Amino acid sequence: MSLSLLTEPPRPPAFRVPWDELQTFEWVRALEPCPQDPIHHAEGNVWIHTRMVLETLVAMPAWRALSSDDQAAVWLACLLHDVAKPFTTKEEPDGRITAKGHSRAGEMLARRLLWELDAPFSLREMVSGLIRHHQIPFYLIERDDAQKLAAEISLVCRADLLALVAEADIRGRVCQDMQRIVDNIELFRAFCAEEGCYDKPRAFPSDHTRVVYFRSEGRSPDVPIHDDTRSEMIMMCGLPGAGKDTAIRERFADLPVVSLDELRHELEVEPDENQGAVVQAGKERVREHLRRGERFVYNATNLNRQRRGPLLSLAADYGARVRIVYVEAPRSTLLAGNRARAARVPEAVIRRMSERWEVPSLLEAHALDIVLR
């Protein structure tokens, strides 16, 4: 399938949406038989809604005024914003139709689909962030944690582009509360502008202030927090075969390494077997380095927030700074690299891992290095 069909949005003067061409994608065809709740989507199924959203978007003066790169990001986010609904939609006991979790699931599905099509990293990650947060402008202004949520959004996408996605989403449907939601989106725009994070990341007094702010409650993002860290954990992150070992040799050859691959070998555990014992052994070795206040590398896939979370919490408990080094390669390069590994991971396992893949962000660590192979 052609990536250009997705990344080159409709152009003037006609701004024609290529509906027939888009239907060549299996995930587009899957939208049509997916029902929606008539209260929020009286227009019908997900494909009808998606078509209405895209037609609304390309007619919006604010979208037409964007740079070509920003147009492509918003266009693609609108096309993919409900891509996970076919997998998350169900009928509740009371007869209502829900799609709980479709935003987060859509982020991960879009990331995998675009990676397989060799989409540029920056475009793909902007689109993924917009999809994950596409409903937040509907209600952010009503949340007690609006300040923190706005700051979080600004570190993974852009609030100004997100507002356009949300506006196209709500105007591209038939519902009773459209005007209330449109008003909330305008309030979202104003709030993010007041917070200084409408078209740029939220600024913090220091990296440590940022990390502690997102890990705790009741703090101001503007009040500096004393940096009392005494060591550093360097957390590698990336799919098998992406080149994490190479990155360690190039950047951290003089540091001790806790490697889950080596622990699998020691414990004689295959990659497609239960990894509980390997993960626990790795955690204990990490704890030993933290107790000694050392700088060290933790080398594992660490592919989503759930996997990274316990180690990041452990590092925080021991007063360690965290640098995440995320390594990525094109799909063809990655699979070739995996085949060349001594400890080859079955490709079916890599596929399953890519379905739960969340690229790290500065919400999680003091520093983030992106290494693209």
PLM feature spans:
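Pre-Walker A (Motif I) flank of P-loop NTPase domains
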Residues: 224, 228-234, 292-294
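Conserved GTP-binding G-domain of TRAFAC-class P-loop NTPases and closely related GTPase folds
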Residues: 234, 254, 331-373
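Divalent metal-dependent catalytic cores for phosphoryl transfer on phosphate-bearing substrates
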Residues: 58-184
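N-terminal pre-Walker A segment at the start of P-loop NTPase domains
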Residues: 193-228
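Acidic/His-rich, divalent-metal-binding segments that scaffold phosphate/diphosphate chemistry
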Residues: 1-92
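Conserved substrate/cofactor phosphate-moiety recognition/catalytic segment
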Residues: 245-296, 331-335
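Conserved phosphate-donor/acceptor-positioning beta-strand/loop module used by diverse small-molecule
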Residues: 318-337
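Glycine-rich phosphate-binding P-loop
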Residues: 232-252
